[in-house]
């Protein structure tokens, strides 16, 4: 029995992502094998994991058991709270050192960095360093569009005028002097709280994080510009602040500026009104790192786009790094000059997707820990299972739970969570259906809905069908057998093959990734 479980675990570890394996398979333990009845009993540490593993992995474990013993085996799951103690919890392992990614040319693609992700994606995200921070509240504040003047933090006049491009290497830590740190963060407009250490990593954002780390390690060399896109609350702003903060640690003299696109538009208007474009250009053209957030706000603003184009050209020519975020794929942003779109496409464009279940659980538990609250795994799984859209929604839900618990003087439980999130869960219960996914995908690829559950196998039908299966697994709570049944009675292994195939290709094929992003946004409304 133990030999089988070692064999089974090793195979599943190769088949699943590290986070999936650690979350679902590692806590399991074989407890009994009845050779006369051909039954294998496997223990799970809590009810949620038992139900999830039973619905998602029992078929695969049974297949492996049949191959191992050369006879059909019935796999039974039992509840045993001690099962989880046989292996370390998911968050217990120390973070592995960050492995450098091999630098690539400026026209790198998503596939170019995918092969280098293993060391970075498999490492558990490090816990935030227990070091007190002293930046002022102003340092963590975004610049407001109604500031009285154009906000161009001062640079040494001789340096700005000469356009000097050399890095001034600094110590490997932020300045010890609190006032100096405050000034540094005030100039850059970086939020010192947003770092790589407290960025929770999962399948949905591992490519973006890997690219961000590469840029932080090699500014102006790899992936310039770096363009991150995705829906609200998925971590785009966190990542670009993390890049800036890492650069300030590595090179304390670096000239860095984070700015929201709306503030940049406001500064262009003020510079135009005051005939101060020379100062405006001198400042932006002399930066070492420019971080522009939500560039879709440039839409329809031709003068702003023109000034940004000149700044972009000057920065890239001087090997300064440009990082841009948007809520959509560059070519999908309306009202943006084609010259800018072509510049965005010349670097690396990476999507950040909504977090998967395991990542949502990790986000909730880490956030609760930062609030000094011990959130049980069962409650975290319950919330993560029902709230799927983005990190902000999860954090907002957690705040409601904490406030409700404090107000009523009750411990946090699933029952209390249901009460606290009653209105939110009512909305979420109007879930995306597999039937809706089939119709949406069929319309998108111009095939009939009936083709989704037919036995036809031409590529123009089989491919959309696999995409629909993948989306059904990602966006609904249906098990693999249930999804297979809704696709014409197909076996769960067929669904599993489709899910793995599309997930693998998505990480390498930018066009497929874009199509899936469009479909997901359509389905989520």
Swiss-Prot record:
GO terms for cellular component: cytoplasm; plasma membrane. PANTHER family: CHROMOSOMAL REPLICATION INITIATOR PROTEIN DNAA. Keywords: ATP-binding, Cytoplasm, DNA replication, DNA-binding, Lipid-binding, Nucleotide-binding. ATP binds at residues 233, 235-237. Plays an essential role in the initiation and regulation of chromosomal replication. ATP-DnaA binds to the origin of replication (oriC) to initiate formation of the DNA replication initiation complex once per cell cycle. Binds the DnaA box (a 9 base pair repeat at the origin) and separates the double-stranded (ds)DNA. Forms a right-handed helical filament on oriC DNA; dsDNA binds to the exterior of the filament while single-stranded (ss)DNA is stabiized in the filament's interior. This is Chromosomal replication initiator protein DnaA. Its main location: cytoplasm. It comes from Burkholderia cenocepacia (strain ATCC BAA-245 / DSM 16553 / LMG 16656 / NCTC 13227 / J2315 / CF5610). SUPFAM superfamilies: P-loop containing nucleoside triphosphate hydrolases, TrpR-like. Residues 71-188 are annotated as: Domain II. Residues 169-181 have a biased composition (Low complexity). Residues 189-405 are annotated as: Domain III, AAA+ region. Residues 160-182 are annotated as: Disordered. It is found in: Cytoplasm. It comes from the Bacteria. Oligomerizes as a right-handed, spiral filament on DNA at oriC. Domain I is involved in oligomerization and binding regulators, domain II is flexibile and of varying length in different bacteria, domain III forms the AAA+ region, while domain IV binds dsDNA. The gene is dnaA. GO terms for molecular function: ATP binding; ATP hydrolysis activity; DNA replication origin binding; lipid binding. GO terms for biological process: DNA replication initiation; regulation of DNA replication. Belongs to the DnaA family. Residues 1-71 are annotated as: Domain I, interacts with DnaA modulators. Residues 406-525 are annotated as: Domain IV, binds dsDNA.
């Amino acid at each position: 029995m133990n030999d089988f479980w070692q064999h089974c675990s090793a195979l599943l570890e190769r088949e699943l992502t590290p986070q999936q394996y650690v979350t679902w398979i590692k806590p399991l333990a074989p407890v009994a094998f009845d050779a006369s009845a051909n039954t294998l009993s496997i223990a799970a540490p809590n009810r949620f994991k038992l139900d999830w593993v039973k619905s998602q992995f029992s078929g695969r474990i049974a297949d492996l058991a049949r191959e191992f013993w050369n006879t059909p085996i019935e796999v039974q799951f039992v509840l045993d709270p001690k099962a989880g103690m046989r292996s370390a919890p998911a968050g217990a392992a120390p973070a592995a050192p960050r492995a450098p990614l091999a630098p690539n040319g400026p026209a790198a693609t998503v596939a170019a960095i995918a092969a280098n992700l293993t060391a970075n994606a498999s490492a558990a995200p490090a816990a935030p360093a227990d070091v007190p921070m002293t930046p002022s509240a102003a340092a963590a504040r975004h610049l407001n569009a109604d500031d009285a003047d154009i906000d161009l933090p001062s640079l040494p006049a001789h340096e700005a005028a000469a356009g000097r491009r050399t890095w001034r290497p600094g110590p490997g830590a932020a300045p010890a002097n609190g006032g100096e740190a405050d000034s540094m963060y005030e100039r850059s407009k970086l939020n010192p709280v947003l770092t790589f250490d407290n960025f929770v990593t999962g399948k949905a954002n591992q490519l973006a994080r890997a690219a961000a780390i590469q840029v932080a390690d090699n500014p102006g060399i790899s992936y310039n510009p770096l363009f991150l896109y995705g829906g609200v609350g998925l971590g785009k702003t966190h990542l670009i602040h993390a890049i800036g903060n890492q650069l300030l640690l590595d090179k304390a003299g670096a000239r860095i500026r984070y700015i929201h696109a709306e503030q940049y538009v406001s500064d262009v208007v003020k510079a135009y009104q005051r005939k101060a474009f020379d100062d405006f250009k001198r400042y932006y053209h002399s930066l070492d790192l420019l971080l522009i957030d939500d560039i879709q706000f440039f839409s329809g603003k031709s003068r702003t786009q023109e000034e940004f184009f000149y700044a972009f050209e000057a920065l890239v020519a001087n090997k300064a790094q440009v990082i841009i975020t948007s809520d959509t794929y560059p070519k999908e942003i309306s009202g943006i000059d084609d010259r800018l779109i072509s510049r965005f496409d010349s670097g690396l464009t990476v999507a950040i997707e909504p977090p998967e279940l395991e990542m949502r659980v990790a986000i909730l538990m880490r956030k609760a820990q930062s609030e000094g609250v011990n959130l049980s795994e069962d409650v975290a799984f319950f919330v993560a299972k029902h709230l799927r859209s983005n990190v902000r929604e999860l954090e907002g839900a957690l705040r409601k739970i904490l406030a409700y618990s404090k107000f009523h003087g009750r411990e946090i439980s699933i029952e209390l969570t249901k009460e606290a999130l009653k209105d939110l869960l009512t909305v979420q219960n109007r879930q995306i259906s597999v039937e809706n996914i089939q119709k949406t995908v069929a319309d998108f690829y111009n095939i009939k809905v009936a083709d989704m559950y037919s036995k036809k196998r031409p590529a123009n039908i089989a491919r959309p069908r696999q995409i629909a299966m993948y989306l059904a697994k990602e966006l609904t709570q249906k098990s693999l057998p249930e999804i297979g049944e809704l696709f014409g009675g197909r076996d769960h292994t067929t669904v599993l093959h489709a899910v793995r195939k599309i997930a693998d290709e998505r990480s390498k094929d930018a066009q497929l990734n874009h199509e899936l992003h469009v479909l997901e946004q359509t389905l989520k409304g």
